[in-house]
Amino acid sequence: MGFTVNYFALISNTCQKIGVKYVSWTCDNPLISMYHVSVFNDCNYIFTFDKTNYLEFKEMGVKHIWYLPLAVDVDRIDMILQKSEDSIKYSGDIAFVGSLYERNSYDRIKPTLPEYLRGYFDAVMEAQLNISGANIVEPMLTTDILEQLQQHFSLEKSEGSFSDLGLIFQTTVLGFKIAEIERRRALIELSKHFRVNVYSNSNVSDLVRVQYCGSVDYWSEMPKVFHESKINLNFTIPNIKSGIPLRIWDVLGAGGFLMTNYQAEIPLYFKEGEDLICFDGVEDLAEKTGYYLEHEKERREIAHNGYEKVKQHHSYVNRIETILETIA
């Protein structure tokens, strides 16, 4: 049996050829490599964390695909936090760990687009930024718009790929630009009123009020940031249509207090207001940030509830057991 995190067509075809099972569990969505004819191979056992993505491939006729949310290794994180002697240097009021996607494809190609398309895409992105928990970009990329776009945007596909212009453009171009706008707007607004620490490889020189803390190692340092910060922020990239991104599990598994945008699958596993806090737009985020900075007891209770929930029900052991039972 072969196993990978995320799906690889070459490995699937190899496993199909030699007659062994190929198990993959996606942590990115949508995973462009899945839009390949090899996804129909009988050897595949594909697990995806986004239910919308699962339903899409199920409707295509992919037989061996299942929905499986991501998880967190609380025991590993507990060990890091217990042994830590430098946690205080990661403390702060508000923390954001992640990319600002300032090096995105949209900024590069925008000058080459006609004025109408630039205005249209700017309007689509602005509309998406005002809607929480749903992706509206895909239906806005109409046949007419895509026909105009293909004159200015070249689509390169590998042999066997059935990804199309709409999928590639909404994912690799608009999706990352929307994420950049959302994150910068939120951090700028919050930094007007609160102390905000940003841990990132991105260029934040234009965010004059934030405290730039450099990047942190995912395995050894990031849990300390989440544990020691009063409020941790998550902004789910719109490419993830309904699923719960890994960052949510990471924060809760470190015992951190989490404020996140709404995702459709959050209510399936967590109680908003008890395990984590959801915000709807920058104004709501700023208001709730002020409230929870002032209400420490409530904030700590919510962080503890989220931690206990992922510890008891959402470990990697739980998920691997599910995978093994499914493929048996």
What spans do the regions from the language model cover?
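A structural signal for well-ordered alpha-helical segments within the folded catalytic domains
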Residues: 9, 13, 51, 181-191, ...
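A short, gly/pro- and small-residue-rich
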Residues: 15-28, 62, 110-121, 185, ...
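Short beta-strand/turn micro-motifs composed of small residues
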Residues: 4, 26, 48, 98, ...
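Extended catalytic core of nucleotide-activated donor transferases of GT-like folds
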Residues: 1-61, 74-83, 214, 219-220, ...
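N-terminal pre-catalytic "stem/leader" segment of glycosyltransferase-like enzymes
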Residues: 1-18, 167-172, 196, 302, ...
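Nucleotide-sugar donor-binding catalytic core of glycosyltransferases
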Residues: 63-64, 69-240, 263-264
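Catalytic binding pocket for nucleotide-activated donors in carbohydrate/polymer assembly enzymes
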Residues: 39-40, 51, 55-63, 68, ...
